[in-house]
From Swiss-Prot:
GO CC list: extracellular region
Family: Belongs to the NXPE family.
InterPro entries the UniProt entry points to: Ig-like_fold, Ig_E-set, NXPE4_C, NXPH/NXPE
Protein's organism: Rattus norvegicus
The protein's name: NXPE family member 4
Residue stretches spanning the membrane: none
UniProt keyword Amino-acid biosynthesis, yes or no: no
Length: 542
């Protein structure tokens, strides 16, 4: 009898366990793997098959988490700066030609170190004064013969007037420029359109299973009723989706490329604002050259730039094609001596890969290590065994835009890479996010930045001596594809990134301000910009 009772108890217990497993799988398949600590990932992404996909990226199913609340908070701040500005006709939008720029307290000659202020009064194409702000302006002073340049600070009074302030860093003939990049009505349209859809870029996933090769559509969001592969970073609740090929497992994905989709969330009238003739139009007019002299002023002695120093606005200026910070001085540092004994992790997009290529070209003892990957986005490693220098570059996770095919076998989010780094005083991390996120709603970018922020918090807790450097996004080409790639999208990301990382001990290289000062409109800045970025980096770590 006791044996029979024991068997009954065992069967009851077994039934309860089976029921619990079935219920857990039904409610949350990822949680089951976490409970048993079983590997359920492919390249750090959990693979889950779904018959449909939500219309927005995956969020935790519980009540709003700290991440969701933080995203909401940042979005609310940005929304306040970019209110809706509907317009009935192009004539009612801001006109660079009819707007008025007035130099305050004009002088025949100015002195180095002075501040020059310009009041801008925005007017529409009918010459009417604008009653609200929000125009996207870019201010720059330059002396082409001296290969000198600096950005100007723009203050928006939200009533149709702006104060543009220039710090006069050098002597000579200086040209002043205030560009109307987009009128406030265009800014409002771009902001609305950006946050409206995830499908301006479509990705093609390449699956290989045996002798068969299949291509299917992939995206951050796929509005499809067919079965999908979900590549989920369960820790940060970030997902990427592909249509599941028939009879091919989700884990068989090997490569990807992307293409622009013929879709727009702008009206025909709004699109007229982004014709090339309406982008980056000069406000200053012809009377834009001033004369600056030394005036026998003493040049203030600045301390050497070092990690953690606060920066001014603007952050510096270009002189003879070399960057000069406003609040500190850059010491000449021998690159090889500085990097001796250091492990340098470069993470991000191709603007960080430019750093890798610069290091390899300037340190002739660095030897590339073949990691048996292919393509422009392959993980790169270069070492100098004698000097114990180790530099590596790794791309960030999805989204990665590129018409060329790239491997996704080893792709993972930057946060997961950081989580694997032990860190110590000779370990340096440099990361950058931005360009590949512009065509998608900004919550995608904010979520990724927050995941990197949390990973860095964990790293600095376990290894506070690790040095972390953030290189901000830079400006890019002024083409006709403003809905996807406008610098306005980059600027909002730049603002969000500075907000997110302000509480961490992170050195900042302000590539945005630098590329405005250099006057480059190139997603891949020229070598003199990369050299200046790396010079700041070397001063931070040595």
């Amino acid at each position: 009898m006791k044996m029979m009772a024991s068997r009954k108890s065992l069967w009851v217990l077994l039934f309860i366990v089976i029921f619990w497993i079935s219920f857990t799988v039904f409610r949350n398949p990822v949680k089951l793997w976490a409970v048993f600590k079983l590997p359920a990932s492919f390249n750090q992404w959990d693979l889950i098959m779904k018959s449909s996909c939500p219309k927005v990226p995956l969020n935790p199913s519980v009540s709003p988490t700290e991440t969701e609340l933080r995203i909401r908070e940042i979005l609310e701040k940005l929304n306040k700066q970019i209110p809706p500005r509907p317009f009935a006709h192009l004539n009612n939008t801001t006109s660079a030609t009819h707007s008025i720029a007035t130099i305050l307290n004009p002088q025949d000659t100015y002195c180095v170190g002075d501040q020059l202020d310009i009041l801008v009064e925005a007017r529409d194409h009918l010459r009417n004064r604008k009653g609200y702000g929000g125009d996207f302006l870019r201010a720059r002073m330059s002396s082409p013969a001296l290969k000198a340049g600096a950005s100007g600070k723009v203050t928006d009074f939200n009533n149709g007037t702006y104060l543009v302030s220039f710090t006069l860093f050098w002597e000579g003939q200086v040209s002043l420029s205030i560009l109307l990049m987009h009128p406030s009505e265009g800014v409002s349209a771009l902001w609305r359109a950006r946050n409206q859809g995830y499908d301006r870029i479509i990705f093609s996933g390449h699956f290989v299973s045996g002798a068969s090769q299949v291509h299917t559509d992939c995206a951050l969001v796929l509005n499809s009723s067919v079965e999908l592969c979900q590549y989920l970073d369960a820790q940060d609740q970030e997902a990427f989706y592909c249509v599941k090929p028939p009879n091919v497992p989700c884990a068989a994905i090997t490569h990807m490329h992307s293409k622009n989709k013929d879709i727009s969330y702008l009206s025909q009238q709004e699109r007229s604002l982004f014709e090339r003739s309406n982008i980056a139009v000069e406000i200053m007019g012809k009377s834009n050259v001033i004369s600056v002299s030394k005036c026998n002023k003493a040049v203030p002695v600045k301390k050497k730039c070092k990690f953690g120093m606060a920066s001014a606005i603007p952050t510096g200026h270009v002189w003879k094609n070399t960057w000069n910070p406003a609040s500190c001085s850059l010491a000449p540092i021998k690159m090889k001596d500085c990097l001796r004994g250091k492990l340098v992790h470069l993470m991000g997009d191709s603007t960080m890969r430019q750093w890798m290529e610069y290091f390899k070209s300037k340190i002739n003892t660095l030897r590339p290590v073949d990691l048996h990957e292919t393509g422009r986005l392959q993980h790169q490693l270069a070492v100098d065994l004698d000097e114990k220098i180790n530099i590596q570059w790794q791309k960030h996770g999805f989204p990665l835009i590129g018409s060329l095919v790239y491997s996704v076998k080893e792709i993972e989010n930057t946060a997961r890479i950081i989580d694997r780094i032990g860190g110590e005083k000779n370990t340096v991390i440099v990361f950058s996010l931005g360009q590949h996120f512009r065509p998608f709603p900004i919550d995608v970018f904010i979520r990724r930045a927050l995941s990197v922020h949390r990973a860095l918090q964990r790293l600095l807790l376990r290894s506070p001596d690790t040095l972390v450097v953030l290189k901000t996004e830079n400006t890019r080409e002024l083409n006709n594809d403003m809905e996807r790639f406008s610098d306005f999208h980059g600027y909002t990301q730049y603002l969000a990134l500075k907000n997110i990382f302000q509480d961490l001990r992170v050195g900042v290289i302000d590539a945005w301000d630098m590329t405005v000062a250099y006057g480059t409109n190139d997603v891949h800045p020229p070598e003199e910009v990369v050299r200046s970025e790396i010079n700041i980096f070397l001063n931070y770590i040595c």
